[in-house]
Amino acid sequence: MILLIRKRTLLYTWLAVCMIGLSAIFLAGSRRAFTPTGAMGQGSRVQTVVIDPGHGGQDGGAVAGDGTEESRINLAISLQLEQFLRFAGVRTELTRREDVMVCDPGLETMRQRKVSDLHNRASFVNDVPNAVLLSIHQNSLPSSPVTHGAQTFWNRQEGAEALARTLQAGLNPVVNTHRAKEPKPIPDSIYLMNHVDAPAVLVECGFLSNREEAARLQQADYQKTLAAVIAAGYLRWMAGEDRK
């Protein structure tokens, strides 16, 4: 079973990388600028993908049974995602490149640091012209250790729902092989997603509360597969294949 999963993972990585390569060739030969699906009235301004590795530093996020923190997995996937997107010619920015909080210095309490962290991430995204936000996270549901799979959530900005659905369509055959998941609107309680002006999608790549999935999420090859699928989905959305 493990060998089958690894073979399937490698296959989908290869397919996603091929799609990224073809998209890079197509976009390199095209004179049109990178513009978000749905147009959003942005004209020909070049689009920048802001990749947000959730949590970081003292805020480790969800924790797997073996003690592995979500923040490190988020960063690993995000750095791979950046490489794939840059290979395709897409401009990128990251909210963090190390396992640190993005908060102001000198704050005394964890609550203060978390609030500052979220405010700074939102400001970072809003300062990037013509941005699209991809926020990378891991899920956890200790009360149901069998729950697994990847799911996307979109904010209220134009184009976000179409992007979330495109990403979910790519993730389902790779991660949710037993039961496909549906993308959903982001809850009002998620500060960052509701305080950015850009179309934004939060990607929950898997459940750290599921022992088998947590083990896969820590594997470099699986992280690369997730990044490749997300990158391929973004390129498909940007090319206008899933505008509706």
Spans of features found by a protein language model:
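Catalytic-site microenvironment of enzymes
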Residues: 1-244
